[in-house]
Amino acid sequence: MVIQKEKKSCGQVVEEWKEFVWNPRTHQFMGRTGTSWAFILLFYLVFYGFLTAMFTLTMWVMLQTVSDHTPKYQDRLATPGLMIRPKTENLDVIVNVSDTESWDQHVQKLNKFLEPYNDSIQAQKNDVCRPGRYYEQPDNGVLNYPKRACQFNRTQLGDCSGIGDPTHYGYSTGQPCVFIKMNRVISFYAGANQSMNVTCVGKRDEDAENLGNFVMFPANGNIDLIYFPYYGKKFHVNYTQPLVAVKFLNVTPNVEVNVECRINAANIATDDERDKFAPRVAFKLRINKT
């Protein structure tokens, strides 16, 4: 014989729920007395307080071993990478000479990028250094004492400086300037007391043919030793990264040209199997003319 369980009415369910939340007979709140709730809250307070204290202590101990100015560990690759300016999506520099809007965005980006390189700003913040040697500065033991940096003046970029330039870095005439920027690597030395230089080529034979002639600023794409070593963002507050400007004079119009630029120095390996692209940057250049 099957005994059917009596179905509770809605009122009974509500009454049972109210009694669970607060039972006036046993003085229990949600099935526990005040003492029971106090012990539970005390347990979790002590438990999570202990975890917080342990986490804080371990973080404090770890931070005592880390310098706020120089990283304790550095990347396995000591070779600096390269980037280009203007910064574009997918590293594609596309210029429609007759369409001002196509290259005006590049000009605006370059104006902002080169503003810290103005000669007047450099004269206020940085030193005039003797070329051809590293600008090494001893550690005087005062961590908050900033290192000095050498001037890199905008006028060193010649026809690509954009100073009084009616051609807007050459973009309005189909002779655009592209700037090569080397990433900062703390305590990097080029080696052999010889300046580094940047070279650019077409990636394939047809690219080399379509690339045409170009000129570099500073001359021969040289990067002087005075901008090294780099001591870090907090030590080298006013450090200015050296640039190499490449002005492309007669790129074959309406053709996509693959360009590769690399940095050359005695202490930079260009055949490192761990990262074959570390000392170079590849980008596409297209000059559209109607």
UniProtKB/Swiss-Prot annotation:
This is Sodium/potassium-transporting ATPase subunit beta-2. Belongs to the X(+)/potassium ATPases subunit beta family. It is found in: Cell membrane. Disulfide bonds join C129-C150, C160-C177, C200-C261. Residues 193-289 are annotated as: immunoglobulin-like. Residues 68-290 are extracellular. One of its GO terms (biological process) is intracellular potassium ion homeostasis. Glycans are attached at N96, N118, N153, N193, N197, N238. PANTHER family: SODIUM/POTASSIUM-DEPENDENT ATPASE BETA SUBUNIT, SODIUM_POTASSIUM-TRANSPORTING ATPASE SUBUNIT BETA-2. The gene is ATP1B2. One of its GO terms (molecular function) is ATPase activator activity. The keyword Nucleus does not apply. GO terms for cellular component: sodium:potassium-exchanging ATPase complex. The chain crosses the membrane at residues 40-67.
